[in-house]
């Protein structure tokens, strides 16, 4: 390289500080108020929120609250043909280790407090999938005196899967919709 070539790393004597480095002036936008800009625009918060929601969607742990015949279709979704684990969703036996509860089947008045107790044991953020006509609105037994007309009267439901019974494909689609919902929602409150 010749002495006349452009050297972006070389500073003139006028711009060099006492330490030999560049001293920013008061009008330098990078150094003045960087934390103010981050607080205002939330760059770091948005990036962390995207990272957290990506991690949550790729590691959903689900548990079953299988009450009737819809639970059989739920078992099909976990088998090799549909394989929910390839989407990052694995079954768990304890509510304390799960993020998603699948309510599948007819919910009776006697079973409703147990459903609420299991839901309360789940850590935040927690999600509920209502699977089948019976869990969605009472289904075939809607007019029975002992049936809760939808599990959304007991716990907040995020995804409804219709059908009697819904297929395993419908459950996989419901899980994918739940992943989209988690990505859309933020997890960090500002």
UniProtKB/Swiss-Prot annotation:
It is an enzyme of class 7 (translocase). [4Fe-4S] cluster binds at residues 69-70, 134, 164. It is a peripheral membrane protein. GO terms for biological process: aerobic respiration; electron transport coupled proton transport. It is found in: Cell inner membrane. Its cofactor is [4Fe-4S] cluster. Binds 1 [4Fe-4S] cluster. Its EC number is 7.1.1.-. Keywords: 4Fe-4S, Cell inner membrane, Cell membrane, Iron, Iron-sulfur, Membrane, Metal-binding, NAD, Quinone, Translocase, Transport, Ubiquinone. NDH-1 is composed of 14 different subunits. Subunits NuoB, C, D, E, F, and G constitute the peripheral sector of the complex. PANTHER family: NADH DEHYDROGENASE (PTHR11995), NADH DEHYDROGENASE [UBIQUINONE] IRON-SULFUR PROTEIN 7, MITOCHONDRIAL (PTHR11995:SF14). Belongs to the complex I 20 kDa subunit family. This is NADH-quinone oxidoreductase subunit B. It comes from Hyphomonas neptunium (strain ATCC 15444). The gene is nuoB.
